[in-house]
Amino acid sequence: MVTAAFLFVSGNSAEALCIKTKKANLRKGPGVKHEKLWEVLKYMPLQKVARKGAWYKVKDLDGDIYWAHQKLFTKKFKCAVIKQDKTNLRTGPGTKHKPVEWSPVDKYFSMKVMRVKNNWVEVMDAAGDKAWVHRPLIWIR
């Protein structure tokens, strides 16, 4: 675990970013004339791998590459995204806690990281609803 964290920090110029706007278009190339490949929602975490002017080349949890304008991102907080469909979000940190009313959620559901307690992460969605999720079930950047 320590090694993975070290590699992320010391590896090339990869940088953790979060979508800060309600919606964001991820494109095939750097510019609005390039095809829109995916529209993501607030708090989607991405990893910056390159830059061309005001455009960032980014990688998602699946390793797919896109381009997005720098004004769509923030580094002020960490974000997380669900890695698989039908993932339970809970009222507290542990399986003894009940799932929240809006659980389960599917892959690509994005959230802001609030805090970590052992192997559980408290998250908040774009509507301001909070829940807990088991750390191995999310990709955090």
Q: Model-predicted segments: where are they?
A:
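Conserved beta-strand/loop element in small beta-rich adapter and peptidoglycan-binding domains
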Residues: 35-52, 96-117
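Bacterial N-terminal signal peptides
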Residues: 1-8
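Boundary regions of SH3-family modules and the immediately adjacent low-complexity/disordered segments
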Residues: 17-22, 30-38, 45-52, 59-88, ...
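Sec/Tat signal peptide C-region and signal peptidase I cleavage site
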Residues: 8-16
